């Protein structure tokens, strides 16, 4: 009551809403002039509007008789814009800048909160505004002057060239046919600035008649600002409760609603989370946390949430691993996504991450190199998989992030059994894709009914010592066999040693040893000393059956060898020079893009890959690396395509012979050697092509591809 007495009602005013000009009333603002300097008394020559864009242009006269007007400058501007000859299209017909154009710009797109008010005879009449425009002077005449200047220069140049040339040269015209436009391309085109400008230009101008403030037509139109209805029945918009009237008078601004503090992408607002459906809450939580026990999930969702509904929802977005829930791979890697590290598609990433999750269902520990060797993915992708659900331990590997949740396993045996069936299906798929041998795979625990036993570091060391002692005799025999091979290979280079044919059992055993000797791996090979110049085993090189350019025996009848040879030939036709390390990397990328169950997944050893390279018409280049080089053995094996069938074969062969004696060479030496061998001086383009095919430049020197050490 005290507040009401201090703030008494002075007067009550009736408010009316006028609608006659609701869709036609604009507010013009002139921000470059103070309010005291209006344009009311200045003659308005023309006016036009684009209603859809709410764009207005006004032409106002300039007082050329004013003592402040610079007549010489006005004549110069008119001359620059229209030129010396005046016609109907001239901007300034009087050859003097006697008018000025004003262009509008929108101050706000939301004018629903603004109205024009007229107070008369104790009544307040409101008319909603259709637009609020700010008009500023336009300097488009300067653009016209620049265009005229360019036209005059072009005409002068054309006149000079026409005197020099008797007839115009024939010009080549390129004809292009547009392909069908995709939906994404159409959306990008529609949202482009060029398209919007073209669309705005297509709307025609509507020419208007301007009437001054004191004109009788203006007085007549001003009457429409008053509400025409005499009774209050027609103004039902204002017959509202106080709260509804206040909401109509001051509606919440959309800009204010959107202007909320935005948290970082890795921070989840629990207040916003509560507004989502339960299934979306579970999905958002698992996508952010990656790994979570069921008890923690229930505590985040709140005490009022039904655990049965949560169990039903969690199984749609996560898998059970050691009693804990791990988000599914397809949630993290949607269908159209790819790896930021290697560019691998989402399907390959999901398959690799499922393999990591499956490995953790078998053991608490996972070794990253083993995962990379099976999945053929780069180290960064595998590290991302492991960081989602594990923590690294020095000299041990990656350990699962959370302890085994035995309580959940005992409390929900039906869920555990269902998850066990799902993992069985995933295991079968992984066996088929990665060609895993079932006999060597660890047996899955029945329903994950008990925690996986932990093995201490001392036990692991003791187990390794025991296995080493058991294999000691086998290793001794293997060492003796290799010594004999080396001794036989170095007896006499010209002596051919006769080899007795093996029985079928011995041949199978030898072939198995050869495949186990050099598995396809990203680690550097330690058996370089057992290879000859071209990367072949000592026993086979002595026989001379697989030297440079000769086919691999059995390639025609071996589909794996044929597929491998096709890959090698296609790769060297593009690259010309490759190290063994780079070739293995490209082969792993090729495997990752093949469909599941492809024949190349059966296993390709380093020896088989090198034999195929030599059989495809390539040769090994014995690059003399410096003694202090940090290159691995695989990086020191350099192979090059000897003959590709084009005109540059001879040039490339000369270049490769140069690098068989030099680790790095200057360009002038290469060019002089090419000129000497070919009998004629090669053009710069021909030398550049040969260098681009086989070499890279670093510090003013040229190296074979893959041999530059950072």
Curated annotation (Swiss-Prot):
Residues 146-169, 498-526 are annotated as: Disordered. There is a cross-link at residue 498 (Glycyl lysine isopeptide (Lys-Gly) (interchain with G-Cter in SUMO1)). GO terms for biological process: defense response to virus; DNA-templated transcription; innate immune response. Residues 146-155 have a biased composition (Basic and acidic residues). Keywords: Antiviral defense, DNA-directed RNA polymerase, Immunity, Innate immunity, Isopeptide bond, Nucleus, Phosphoprotein, Transcription, Ubl conjugation. It is found in: Nucleus. There is a cross-link at residues 171, 432, 498, 661 (Glycyl lysine isopeptide (Lys-Gly) (interchain with G-Cter in SUMO2)). Residues 502-520 have a biased composition (Acidic residues). The modification Phosphoserine is found at residues 161-162, 192, 503. The modification Phosphotyrosine is found at residue 224. GO terms for cellular component: nucleoplasm; RNA polymerase III complex. InterPro entries: RNA_pol_III_Rpc5, RPC5_C. It comes from the Eukaryota. Residues 558-710 are annotated as: Required for Pol III complex stability. Its main location: nucleus. DNA-dependent RNA polymerase catalyzes the transcription of DNA into RNA using the four ribonucleoside triphosphates as substrates. Specific peripheric component of RNA polymerase III (Pol III) which synthesizes small non-coding RNAs including 5S rRNA, snRNAs, tRNAs and miRNAs from at least 500 distinct genomic loci. Assembles with POLR3D/RPC4 forming a subcomplex that binds the Pol III core. Enables recruitment of Pol III at transcription initiation site and drives transcription initiation from both type 2 and type 3 DNA promoters. PANTHER family: DNA-DIRECTED RNA POLYMERASE III SUBUNIT RPC5 (PTHR12069:SF0), DNA-DIRECTED RNA POLYMERASES III 80 KDA POLYPEPTIDE RNA POLYMERASE III SUBUNIT 5 (PTHR12069). Component of the RNA polymerase III complex consisting of at least 17 subunits: a ten-subunit horseshoe-shaped catalytic core composed of POLR3A/RPC1, POLR3B/RPC2, POLR1C/RPAC1, POLR1D/RPAC2, POLR3K/RPC10, POLR2E/RPABC1, POLR2F/RPABC2, POLR2H/RPABC3, POLR2K/RPABC4 and POLR2L/RPABC5; the stalk composed of two subunits POLR3H/RPC8 and CRCP/RPC9, forming a structural mobile part that protrudes out of the core and functions primarily in transcription initiation; and additional subunits homologous to general transcription factors of the RNA polymerase II machinery, POLR3D/RPC4-POLR3E/RPC5 heterodimer and POLR3/CRPC3-POLR3F/RPC6-POLR3G/RPC7 heterotrimer. This is DNA-directed RNA polymerase III subunit RPC5. It comes from Mus musculus (Mouse). The gene is Polr3e.
